[in-house]
A protein has these predicted regions:
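Surface-exposed acidic, glycine-flexible loop patches that form ligand/cofactor-binding
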Residues: 19, 328-332
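Phosphate/ATP-binding catalytic cores across multiple sugar-kinase/actin-like superfamilies
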Residues: 129-132, 317-329
């Protein structure tokens, strides 16, 4: 995993605040480099054409040569495969590929395109896209890291998991070049490590769970696929949520009942997706009967934040209200101020 000092530099496309996505289907972000085209061919050969998902492929392409990757992939799938060179709305059952010398980002339900910065010292195109995917599509994003050299994709994949999405890495012994998958796995944030031929079925299972899952309403959790309308089911869900937090406190010693509700729901929803469970009562039963699940849920609850100053309102209040007072205090002229 990257150290904090190696945080991903802001790209031109990231200077604007990412708007949440309005899309009601999963967006699958796929990062690949050396050996990645062969892995992509196997993935799309095994992916049904009418799967209801969208795929965005970010590869390390030479900025000095045209790429025919989209034409090669089109030979193994009936989904529409497009190489992106201009802003493009994302549609289901489509595959979008990065163009040479370009950077892809996601904003709302669109792909944005900017010219790649030639001064950028290392490949981070996958990280940058996956971070915007996470911020835009949140718990309905999936990040996949395939064959490649280096570590691009590891930080972006971690961000997807932080925002409630699901993460997958190609099994290293199945990858032609295993550095990128191994780097992703080393973050501890990968949900599934699979041979590339098994990834399509996993995606189908995840999408099936997403569109049937039911959770209590919360204004800050994007749930376009399902909602609980029945009052009795809503009460049962709220009771199950309380029981889940009680179980977690009993087994881990950590009490999350005062945590932000949206964060708690997002973390539990992620575990429900991973375990293919459709509602909170089902997850409560799974948690009761699966002792090791408490450890996984706790890890999700305590997942590290991958952005500095992530809570914008809190830091703006700190800048506006607190810091000026510290330096305006009479004793501040002779008293050191420590920042860490």
């Amino acid at each position: 995993a990257r150290a904090m000092s190696e945080e991903i530099p802001a790209a031109e496309g990231l200077k604007l605040k990412v708007q949440p996505s309005h899309l009601n289907f999963p967006v699958i972000g796929i990062g690949a480099s050396a050996g990645g085209l062969a892995a992509l061919l196997r993935l799309f050969e095994n992916m049904p054409n009418d799967n209801g998902m969208a795929f965005v492929v970010v590869m390390h392409l030479s900025p000095h040569h045209e790429s025919s990757a989209h034409e090669i992939l089109q030979k193994v799938t009936k989904m529409k495969v497009r190489q992106i060179s201009e802003p493009t709305p994302i549609e289901r059952n489509c595959v979008y590929l990065i163009s040479p010398a370009m950077q892809l980002t996601m904003n709302d339900g669109y792909l944005r395109v900017t010219e790649l910065n030639p001064a950028q010292p290392r490949h981070i195109a996958i990280d940058i896209f996956m971070r915007t995917l996470a911020d835009a599509h949140a718990e309905h994003a999936v990040a996949i890291v395939l064959s490649g050299s280096g570590s691009d994709g590891s930080a972006g994949l971690s961000r997807v998991k932080e925002q409630g999405g699901v993460t997958i890495a190609q099994a290293p012994d199945d990858a032609e070049y295993d550095e990128m998958p191994r780097s992703a796995i080393a973050t501890g944030q990968v949900d599934f490590i699979l041979p590339v031929g098994d990834i399509p079925q996993k995606l189908i299972d995840l999408w099936q769970t997403m569109r049937t899952m039911q959770l209590p309403a919360d204004a800050e959790v994007a749930t376009p696929f399902r909602s609980i309308d029945d009052p009795e089911q809503s009460r049962a869900a709220e009771t199950a949520l309380k029981d889940i937090l009680t179980l977690l406190r009993t087994r881990s010693g950590h009490d999350f009942k005062h945590y932000k509700r949206a964060t708690v729901l997002r973390r539990i929803e992620r575990r429900m997706q991973v375990n293919r469970l459709g509602d909170l009562p089902a997850y409560r039963a799974f948690l009761q009967n699966t002792p090791e699940e408490a450890r996984h849920l706790l890890a999700d609850m305590l997942i590290g934040v991958t952005n500095f100053f992530r809570d914008r309102e809190a830091f703006e209040a700190l800048e506006r209200e607190i810091i000026p007072r510290v330096f305006d205090m009479p004793e501040s002229a002779d008293t050191p101020v420590r920042v860490w």
